[in-house]
Amino acid sequence: MPREIITLQVGQCGNQIGMEFWKQLCLEHGISKEGMLEDFATQGGDRKDVFFYQADDEHYIPRALLLDLEPRVINGIQNSEYRNLYNHENVFVADHGGGAGNNWASGYHQGEQVEEDIMDMIDREADGSDSLEGFVLCHSIAGGTGSGMGSYLLEALNDRYSKKLVQTYSVFPNQMETSDVVVQPYNSLLTLNKRLTINADCVVVLDNTALNRIAVDRLHIPNPTFAQTNSLVSTVMSASTTTLRYPGYMNNDLVGLVASLIPTPRCHFLMTGYTPLTVERQANAIRKTTVLDVMRRLLQAKNIMVSSYARTKEASQAKYISILNIIQGEVDPTQVHKSLQRIRERKLANFIEWGPASIQVALSRKSPYVQTAHRVSGLMLASHTSIRHLFSKCINQYEKLRKKQAFLDNYRKFPMFADNDLTEFDESREIVQSLVDEYKACESADYIKWGMEDRSKTLSADGTMDLSLPSS
């Protein structure tokens, strides 16, 4: 029986990447823009019910909630050619429509105020599921709504659906460009804090710095637009869910997927790689793809969607905690075995010493309704200790602002920071620093010992933290 997943799209960025994700899923399952099954979609064997359900007239509706505090992006979706795809009861835009002003505290406070309305929508979707497995949250950590309201919803889901798994697709800001959002470091740290570290079971890191680099270097797009980077994100999202929708022998539910990648609860931030990447105008530049070629390329830095400064800093010490390669296409399992052997012989992946040093591989069918130029494609989901440098950069940028006491008045206007109470900032910094320390400790052979001593010290400050994976 399919295990259903409810998707929450929060804020401008969350709704934009969510929209691209649903477009891709419709293509892969032969569903029209109106939600009707196309006449040619007769092959079956896919699980549409994981992400869609059928209305009384048999058209497919995404199990999705579209949530924002300002109307522009959602209005765009509702006026697009996909306007009849969604359940309009699952759309929430704040009455005032003024947004969160790129302020985490505003987004969090407004989330608190509208909790009842949104949780009613979530409860209705959950009640309509036969066997709900969990939730997927799409958001950005840098602005106001996706970070603040997204944080509040993560806490609310943890309270109400503590046994359900929560995975996020979290967009990290472009660190190489000057941001329009001057308080981005505050917002990022507050979101990384308890919310993504404690209230999520798995976080797929979508690093805008790396996405822009890949668009420029790999796809030869000089000035990539948001639409083009969002297209890269939808490719990752659809590929990472392919084993749930086109099930094989393993990793055909979210719990299995997450459990295979996350041996230690807090180190649940995953980086991704995808190959081959093409855009429409490159369709003629087709090369031969093999399992070995795809798996080798997935380990190359240029194909990994996390910033180069995170991957290259102290690179000799950095290690993989786990790797899952999802290979799509007509693949002979013996080729997979030979490819893994070759990668092991060449020592292309440096693993931790305290866990299984192996690349897991899940084979998945390609959608019969989407024609691709390549015979084999692959997505890598990996837990890698170098991700800590991304978090360290967030801390460093936060400290530069905090040292100057810059823009703090914007946050003091809201209850959590009233009366100049900035403990939420201090606690957030401590939690993110402890996360950095834990990833650093993972590089050592005696990490398990560190886990027993240091982790208990770190967590004693907050007795509410439950770090166990939810049971299914």
From Swiss-Prot:
Localization: Cytoplasm, Cytoskeleton, Microtubule organizing center
Keyword set, alphabetical order: Cytoplasm, Cytoskeleton, GTP-binding, Microtubule, Nucleotide-binding
BP GO terms, sorted: cytoplasmic microtubule organization; microtubule nucleation
Residues that hold GTP according to the record: A142, G143, G144, T145, G146, S147, G148
A Gene Ontology molecular function term of the record: GTP binding
Entries under InterPro entries matching the protein: Gamma_tubulin, Tub_FtsZ_C, Tubulin, Tubulin/FtsZ-like_C, Tubulin/FtsZ_2-layer-sand-dom, Tubulin/FtsZ_GTPase_sf, Tubulin_C, Tubulin_CS
Pfam families in UniProt: Tubulin (PF00091), Tubulin_C (PF03953)
Major subcellular location class: cytoplasm
Keyword match Flavoprotein: no
GO cellular component terms, A-Z: cytoplasm; gamma-tubulin complex; microtubule
Highest taxon of source: Eukaryota
Keyword Repressor: no
Biological role stated in the UniProt entry: Tubulin is the major constituent of microtubules. The gamma chain is found at microtubule organizing centers (MTOC) such as the spindle poles, suggesting that it is involved in the minus-end nucleation of microtubule assembly.
Alphabetized PANTHER family for the sequence: TUBULIN (PTHR11588)
UniProt similarity note: Belongs to the tubulin family.
Protein name: Tubulin gamma chain
Organism, as annotated: Anemia phyllitidis (Fern)
Lineage, broadest ranks: Eukaryota, Viridiplantae, Streptophyta, Embryophyta, Tracheophyta
